[in-house]
């Protein structure tokens, strides 16, 4: 009889786990999906388009960075439309490629790339870069959450600038549930290693899940090692962990910072980051 009492919870747990994993499709390697105002491309590891147009507008580059919480709140599209109105580049985390989101991209004339971290109920999830122009190249990166076993994603991309340079942009959603910082460091180093031989301007931004002093120290050290400095926001309403540490950041080099603010929004569980840069030349 005792065996039966023990078996029932185990069978229920096994059934629940099987049901959980039946929902998700995880690519065997990082995949990048191109998203245009007219179509969605087939998954690739990297994308190349050397003849892309320039990203900035007469030397000005406006940036929106936002974890949009899988578009779970009813007013996401209204807020995203308003916040993206004067931006040249959107770096979004926790973006689900729902029919409503595809329609929003189409209606507003955005183009871009999404890292296909996983698929659930037929909808791709992962970070996404949106602009009015395509990058000259972009690659997807993923890192498994060690406990949940679902990947977090990132995009490494390059965009043409009007001064003849290329801008490297890293859009990152960092691993969250880890014991220690090993997986966190692995994810950062894989992306930052791509920057070590690049001498031009760089933006690294996203949801870094920097909820501990150890993570913050590692983040600061790694970004400083490639010559990046952190954007300071005013007002600074960035979403914080219970200990007051901010989760979202923007780092840069080779650009002039003109303005940075983190307003309050109820359209996500994260507040958006708005940054204005100007080219140095």
Curated annotation (Swiss-Prot):
Q: Where in the cell is it found?
A: Cytoplasm
MF terms (GO), sorted A to Z: catalytic activity
Q: Which UniProt keywords apply?
A: Cytoplasm
Look up the signal peptide feature and give its range: none
Query: What domain of life is recorded for the organism?
Result: Bacteria
Q: Name one GO cellular component term.
A: cytoplasm
The record's listing under Pfam families reads: Exo_endo_phos (PF03372)
Query: Hey, which family's this protein in?
Result: Belongs to the UPF0294 family.
- Protein name per Swiss-Prot or TrEMBL: UPF0294 protein VC_2238
Q: Which organism is it from?
A: Vibrio cholerae serotype O1 (strain ATCC 39315 / El Tor Inaba N16961)
């Amino acid at each position: 009889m005792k065996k039966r009492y023990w078996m029932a919870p185990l069978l229920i747990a096994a059934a629940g786990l099987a049901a959980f994993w039946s929902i998700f499709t995880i690519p065997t390697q990082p995949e990048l999906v191109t998203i245009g105002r007219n179509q969605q491309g087939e998954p690739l590891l990297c994308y190349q388009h050397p003849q892309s147009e320039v990203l900035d507008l007469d030397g000005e580059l406006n940036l929106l960075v936002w974890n949009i919480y899988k578009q779970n709140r009813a007013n996401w599209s209204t807020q995203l439309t308003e916040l993206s109105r004067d931006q040249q580049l959107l770096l979004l985390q926790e973006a689900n490629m729902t029919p409503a989101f595809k329609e929003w991209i189409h209606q507003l004339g955005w183009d871009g790339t999404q890292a296909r971290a996983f698929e659930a109920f037929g909808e791709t999830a992962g970070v996404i870069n949106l602009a009015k122009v395509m990058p000259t190249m972009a690659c997807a990166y993923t890192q498994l959450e060690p406990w949940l076993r679902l990947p977090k994603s990132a995009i490494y991309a390059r965009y043409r600038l009007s001064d003849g340079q290329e801008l490297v942009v890293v859009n990152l959603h960092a691993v969250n549930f880890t014991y220690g910082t090993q997986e966190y460091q692995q994810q950062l180093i894989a992306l930052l290693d791509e920057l070590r031989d690049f001498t031009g301007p760089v933006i690294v931004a996203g949801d870094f899940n920097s909820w501990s002093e150890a993570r913050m120290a590692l983040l600061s050290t790694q970004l400083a090692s490639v010559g990046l400095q952190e954007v300071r926001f005013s007002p600074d309403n960035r979403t914080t962990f219970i200990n007051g540490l901010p989760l979202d950041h923007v780092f840069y080099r080779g650009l002039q910072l003109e303005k940075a603010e983190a307003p309050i929004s109820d359209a996500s569980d994260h507040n958006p980051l708005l940054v204005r840069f100007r080219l140095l030349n």
